[in-house]
Amino acid sequence: MKKQKLELTWIGKEDRPRLEPRILLEDQDLSYHSGYRVTEEDLFDNRLIFGDNLLALKALEHEFSGKVKCVYIDPPFNTQQAFEHYDDGLEHSIWLGLMRDRLEIIKRLMNNEGTLFVHIDDNELGYLIVLLDEIMGRSNRVAVITFKQGSATGHKSINPGVVTTSNFLVIYAKNKPIWTPNRLFTARAERDKRYSQFIMNYESHFPKWQF
């Protein structure tokens, strides 16, 4: 990676795993899809991949490089706890290296209008943002959304320290100048009498709205 004026460094940053080209093999016993298409837009190319996610990303790169529109990842929060299926207590430099290796491939998979969502808590939030600024570009950071993940009840209510109830979604665009979010509207069964005006052409860009 090209050196920048401002960057996050850690022990072992220059160490890179050697990734050979990989292929994905279908397990016919576990595969299933409908025998027919309901519409012409139906897709039969969804995949559930079992294995190391770094190797899986590498295997997808040849076919999907520059094509992925949306990526959502939920990496280990590095809470210093040991769970049944994975260790969530990695040393910080190891965690950063693992994240860097995967995020670099994810960036190559994304198309120019793509969006990346990373779900994280406060343990590594600060380091993650700086790492993503370096990989995706600080100018491509869209937002950091805070959402309520829990409540100060139960065992948390007797915690003598600060109680954490929030998680975060860190959002980056592949190329923010051409990135456009999809607007979401919720239909109402009846007219909301609090409003006296209606947008007649809400599908248009907002400067062209007619009331």
What do these predicted ranges mean?
Residues 1-72, 79-94, 98-101:
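DnaQ-like (DEDDh/DEDDy) 3′-5′ exonuclease domain used for proofreading
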Residues 45-47, 67-71, 113-117, 125, ...:
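Beta-sheet entry/capping signal
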Residues 92-146:
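Conserved Class I SAM-dependent methyltransferase catalytic core
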